[in-house]
């Protein structure tokens, strides 16, 4: 069971943003959505989609005031300086009775040290694991917990609240065969709503540049066997592979880029184009843009010949 707690960290967002995030989350293969009382009060008048909801409350009186949730869990202040490695919480049902447990891993613990402990917890009943990402192992802890037979994990989009990133957990479960995706993941709406989150271009799963490749040998390898360099196809996350042209590019990169834009100029000297691309990239101290490449090919491959004609299927420099 995958629980997403992204909304718990959007209390200062507008009600519209909170609702849009909720709707975007329901399009992903998650099993429950957790939110705070503040967020719920903001969106309660809107039509909430059918879903299991967990409410993060301040005290037991909130359980009486907000009936109908799948579970309730009390908000806590985590003391990072505590000697404890984890905190155990009770999860309540709508009648206020203890129904499950949650363990928040708060210390700098690694997967290697937790496997045996996970097995012990699993034998002791229904348990939700909330691994925090203090040493960049939250995703690994979440995956290992579920692989060992754990029931549920708490995640958040892009690791909000120092949680295991939702997108990384979903993709890890897919590539390891624990929980296969039935359709591609689309995080575009989540990224739009969470516009104040700084997402690195190389952030796993959702980074804009994770399928960008420049090195000639890598481009050649991807053309022959994408699985050598990509753990999953870009289409699985609603993305596309992008060849970047720069001083690390090779002949395969030029050929692939020509094919990408359906550039037809008779006999094209790809070696000459590659030399110019590398020099231009070196002079500019950056990769050259697709527009610059198309103009370059037009200048080199078609100048002075009426018979040579560039066909732009995706692009037009005019």
Q: What is each model feature region?
A:
Residues 4-8, 22-26, 184-318:
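A mid-to-C-terminal "edge-of-domain" accessory segment
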Residues 110-228:
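Catalytic alpha/beta core domains of metabolic enzymes, predominantly
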Residues 1-15, 115-128:
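N-terminal small/glycine-rich loop or linker at the start of catalytic domains
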Residues 10, 35, 104-107, 129-134, ...:
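Glycine- and other small-residue-rich loops at beta-strand/loop junctions that grip anionic moieties
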Residues 17-31:
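Alpha-helical scaffold segments that flank or form the walls of functional sites
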